[in-house]
Amino acid sequence: MAEGPYLMGIDGGTGGVRAGIFDRKGEALVFHGVEHGTRFPRPGWAEQDPADWWSCLVEAVRGAVERSGVSPEEIAGVSTDATTCTVVALDRQNRVMRPALLWMDVRASDQARRVQETGDPALKYNGFGPSSAEWMPSKTLWLKENEPETYENAVRICDYADWMTFRLTGEWTASINTASFRAYYDRNTGGWPESLYGALGIGDVLEKFPPRVLDMGTAVGGLTREAAEELGLPEGLPVAQGGGDAFVGALGLGVTEPGKLALITGSSHVIVGQAADPHYGQGFFGSYTDGIVPGQYSVEGGQVSTGSIVAWFKNQFAAAAAAEANKRGVDTYDVLNELAGNVPIGSDGLIVLDYFQGNRTPYTDPLARGMIWGLSLGHTPGHVFRAILEGICYGTEHIFRTMREHGFQPGEAVVAGGPTKSELWMQMHADVSNVPVSVPRESEGPVLGSAMLSAVGAGVYPNIQEAADNMVHTERTIEPNGEAHEEYKFYVDRYVETYPQMRGLMHEMSRHEASRSGSTAVAEA
């Protein structure tokens, strides 16, 4: 039975805004989501209108409250998460000056190269390797060079989550989470890296960022009268500092202790781990001080294309499996999993490189491309489907290996998302990486994580750890099979060796195709 007080979490995702209401034990009463669009003006560009975010947020909150049966006065607090780094520029009247640059926008590829070329000490966060075109320095530099009027007249440049907090409270704050993970903020060295931004010629942007950087869960203020009237919530309702969707999602999976990692799955994999001590090195991002849990360090990795490759295969090449599924009254994925389950480990020598849309880690290479190699006339659709699942697991293990090389030891992976429905895939992840894989009872990690932060900000729980202990619950744990792990090692090694040998051809092909389509973002990368 639901137990008050009730907590609200709001998730600003790529495709829409989702609100959820939970009781103090983490039991979900309701979720309500509202979708919005994305514009793609040119290849490699992606923009959204913050006005759409707000209208969707209002509708999502009102819908959640109405469907929950909970009185607005019974809600103790609210917090938010959103995509990062989705950049908003505002004028002196706090009016949005242009469409927001969405996280997936890579128009700043040339600027990202110049960020790396500075060699600034702040680049330790990515091992002094390639900096991402998605991140704040690259995008703000692009604004200054390509839209100087917007840049000069912008009084505030912030991330999506910071903008939501401002709309709710009227207070300008930045999350330690997004500031450190996406803008090189480091409170151990004084905060914003002035030398990095100065070397790029955008030192003045530091005055445009929100003036206060807060830990997640910190009380920011109360709902303004205007926001309260629009949302149908009480004026003064406590609002807690939120953060990036994947990282707040890690909280919602209970990743609050050293050695634990969140594996947040969907069209991509986001990997976020907690450590007791800092770890730095090329091939992953971090360590970020207090980035998620105060007093701990966070590391991050990611795979650009995972579930999207699985869906691609099902939609393009699984007509026979779909027909069989329709005949039996089951899902197409059920049939594909059965076929893959009858194929031995290693898919009879078939390797899939999951770089279909580039590589996030360990190479941060937007020009990398996917591969299927080792094909023979004896391979079947079941072989290819299994090889896709295995290839994604190999990519995760490659990131884990890179982290291990620099001192971080993954002890447990907590997984959320659609792939948790596949026992075969979850067992593969456990076997390939030789770590237990846990599946939480509540899969809506970002919304729950935001609700947990609201619980801390409202004083329902004294800190994030207490909130996690009370609000996150494990449904099942998959233990690794040692024999299978030993058998997988050979195939993981072949996977790891593939990219270095094919990198030159990948880049040549990617640039050639980009020049044919007119995509300057890729052609200049």
Predicted regions and their residues:
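Active-site core segments that coordinate phosphate-bearing ligands/cofactors
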Residues: 2, 7-9, 113-130, 138-173, ...
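Short, acidic/turn-prone active-site loops that include or flank metal/cofactor-
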Residues: 34, 102-108, 178-179, 267-269, ...
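Short beta-strand-loop/turn "lid" adjacent to the catalytic site in phosphate-handling enzymes
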Residues: 66-103, 129-136, 165-185, 212-217
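Residue-level signal for inorganic ion chemistry
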Residues: 26, 49, 78, 105, ...
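Structural signal for short hydrophobic segments within the conserved structured cores
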Residues: 30-34, 211, 476
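A short local loop/turn or secondary-structure capping micro-motif enriched for an aromatic residue
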Residues: 37-40, 106-108, 280, 307-308
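N-terminal glycine/serine-rich phosphate-binding loop of ATP-dependent small-molecule kinases
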Residues: 1-98, 153, 229, 233, ...
